[in-house]
Amino acid sequence: MQKRSSFDSAEIMHRAEDLMQAASNRYRITVQVAQRAKRRRYEEFDAVEDPLMKPPIRAIIEMSDELTQPEIIGE
């Protein structure tokens, strides 16, 4: 039985590519996504909005939405 997800994997890949292209350092943006995902995981451990959306995917979506804020991408 296949589970239906509430997000499109192609859209997630596109957003991740946009993050990588906007960043000056691929390693740094990867670490920032991982840190945000880890932080969100512990902050919202009890309040699960969408159990199918994992913290790294949520972090990619949030960070791609914040591309207009340069402090998110890096110095």
From Swiss-Prot:
The keyword Nucleotidyltransferase applies. GO terms for biological process: DNA-templated transcription. It comes from the Bacteria. Its EC number is 2.7.7.6. GO terms for cellular component: DNA-directed RNA polymerase complex. It holds the Pfam family RNA_pol_Rpb6. It catalyses: RNA(n) + a ribonucleoside 5'-triphosphate = RNA(n+1) + diphosphate. GO terms for molecular function: DNA binding; DNA-directed RNA polymerase activity. Keywords: DNA-directed RNA polymerase, Nucleotidyltransferase, Transcription, Transferase. It is an enzyme of class 2 (transferase). InterPro entries: DNA-dir_RNA_pol_omega, Pol_omega/Rpo6/RPB6, RPB6/omega-like_sf. NCBIfam families: PRK00392.2-5. Belongs to the RNA polymerase subunit omega family. In cyanobacteria the RNAP catalytic core is composed of 2 alpha, 1 beta, 1 beta', 1 gamma and 1 omega subunit. When a sigma factor is associated with the core the holoenzyme is formed, which can initiate transcription. Promotes RNA polymerase assembly. Latches the N- and C-terminal regions of the beta' subunit thereby facilitating its interaction with the beta and alpha subunits. This is DNA-directed RNA polymerase subunit omega. It comes from Picosynechococcus sp. (strain ATCC 27264 / PCC 7002 / PR-6).
